[in-house]
Amino acid sequence: MPKRVLTGTVVSDKTDKTVVVKVERRVKHALYGKIIKRSKKYHAHDETNEYREGETVRIEETAPMSKLKTWKVIERVDTHATPNHA
């Protein structure tokens, strides 16, 4: 079975070798039909601490590394993002 790959925005890079990535998806409301946004946060492994808050990254599912980390960052998608901290 292929590994899942998701694209999202880094919302936190405060922990060592870990980033929190927010992945948004658009779904249609079952009754009213309006398109609404749903989001979920994933803890992803960042071995070199190179990804910063605000960047768009691609993450891939891996074997569990800890209680929360079952994803790893593959690559940076958007290089023009400006980090929120100095």
Swiss-Prot record:
Q: Which UniProt keywords apply?
A: Ribonucleoprotein, Ribosomal protein, RNA-binding, rRNA-binding
GO annotation, biological process: translation
**Classification via SUPFAM superfamilies:** Nucleic acid-binding proteins (SSF50249)
Gene Ontology terms: cellular component: cytosolic small ribosomal subunit
Database matches in Pfam families: Ribosomal_S17
Q: Name one GO molecular function term.
A: structural constituent of ribosome
**Which residues belong to the signal peptide in this entry?**
none
Q: How does it assemble?
A: Part of the 30S ribosomal subunit.
Q: Which family does it belong to?
A: Belongs to the universal ribosomal protein uS17 family.
Q: What does this protein do?
A: One of the primary rRNA binding proteins, it binds specifically to the 5'-end of 16S ribosomal RNA.
Q: What is this protein called?
A: Small ribosomal subunit protein uS17
Q: Which organism is it from?
A: Rhizorhabdus wittichii (strain DSM 6014 / CCUG 31198 / JCM 15750 / NBRC 105917 / EY 4224 / RW1) (Sphingomonas wittichii)
